[in-house]
Amino acid sequence: YSAGLPFPLVDANDPNAALKVMWNFSYRPLYTDDAISKNTEIASYRPGSSPADPVEHFTIGNVGFYNNIGRTEVNPIPTDPEATRANIRYRFGAYPFLEPSEMRGFGFIRYRSIDPKIEDNSWMMSPRTRHTRRASASELADVFGLLDAAAGGGNGGAGTYASNLDPDSFFGFAAKIEDFNYRFLGEKPMLAVVHAENSPAKACPNDGGRTICPENWEMRRLYVIEADAKQTSALGSGPTIPKRIFYIDSEGWFITASDQYDRDGKLWKTVATFNAYRDRPIPDARVAIWPFKRMFQTALVDEDVTNGFSTVVLSPGVETEEHESWYINMGLATENFFNPASMANAAH
């Protein structure tokens, strides 16, 4: 594999169809080289709350990643030498958290290995101790573990922050492809947001603003894939979300929605993503202007269907002066950003 779509043609009758769809998703054209999203906002709501009164509101200074494989626009192309030198497929970072004030400075970094047998190397920055520590794969697969670490606990601390979203659900799914078994459930025409009208996204008036809904919904042909977590020692007793159903766009290869099941096999949460296709993230952009139209995520909603609690991710955010947000394949995500020492410095 060098770059582009690993499997341009997927036959539904192919016994490996599900795995091919997932690798197409993994190397999807949304962000091939690097990306930085500035001032990403995450807000959580209970039924009855409003956009003006969230249970919790987070702002992350920078969310970024750098791919070593499959690069198409920014040198080195198509493979960064680090891929073979360090066996790293890509790096991801989300830091520093700017609010709430007691979480200021929190963040995490993860490196994904090319080797399917090697789990992610991850680090978290504790706002309480002002030190970085290694994070386990199970913490990044569990929203409660992440919040515990954010509270400064980490294996025993008291996590007090309200959110549905776990790092493995970023962009619909961010866990290691090799850690799951996949089953092809079929193709279905379903509604999805691929050409979002609003960027930043607008809150839904029908549920008090707990989700996103006034959008340009359209019928899309989606692949439906079941993902079941393998039993690995890295995940301990198993992830809190052992089963997921993905609805993957057959043209853009991103996850439009995902149903998430708990350890008892019951539907627990559902995720919906909102995506746009344009040459700039906002109409009046001055810097983030791309040479051609790109797909990018404007929002993600992660809702607990058992109690109506929802978490909404906005990129661009609505409360920040930085509305351009998405800097895709512009070379802004450098190796230094993904250094745990840089994360520690940003927290001080």
Residue ranges and their predicted role:
Residues A17, D304, A333-T334:
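Helix N-terminus capping/helix-initiation residues
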Residues Y182-R183, D264:
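Generic structural motif
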